[in-house]
Amino acid sequence: MKQSLAVKTFEDLFAELGDRARTRPPGSATVAALDAGVHTLGKKVLEEAGEVWLAAEHESNEALAEEISQLLYWTQVLMISRGVSLDEVYRKL
């Protein structure tokens, strides 16, 4: 897969989110999400998964890609909240 220089990878996002979790910058939506807890994060993952499904059924590929990116974001925030590493997930693929 060829990427442009402006593209953020799955690993880049995970590193960025992990950094926010460690440094806790004021006003960070990621920090607020982490502080909300696993229950809230899990509900957000379910919501985004539903939006991915609906976009796949009824919207453009661009809209679908946006919904998938949001699902990946929330899944990674949940992973960080629980202390699950990318390697742990990759071993299950």
Curated annotation (Swiss-Prot):
It catalyses: 1-(5-phospho-beta-D-ribosyl)-ATP + H2O = 1-(5-phospho-beta-D-ribosyl)-5'-AMP + diphosphate + H(+). The keyword Zinc does not apply. InterPro entries: HisE, PRib-ATP_PPHydrolase-like. The keyword Cytoplasm applies. Pathway: Amino-acid biosynthesis; L-histidine biosynthesis; L-histidine from 5-phospho-alpha-D-ribose 1-diphosphate: step 2/9. Keywords: Amino-acid biosynthesis, ATP-binding, Cytoplasm, Histidine biosynthesis, Hydrolase, Nucleotide-binding. Its EC number is 3.6.1.31. One of its GO terms (molecular function) is phosphoribosyl-ATP diphosphatase activity. It is found in: Cytoplasm. One of its GO terms (cellular component) is cytoplasm. It holds the Pfam family PRA-PH. One of its GO terms (biological process) is L-histidine biosynthetic process. Belongs to the PRA-PH family. PANTHER family: HISTIDINE BIOSYNTHESIS BIFUNCTIONAL PROTEIN, HISTIDINE BIOSYNTHESIS BIFUNCTIONAL PROTEIN HIS7. This is Phosphoribosyl-ATP pyrophosphatase.
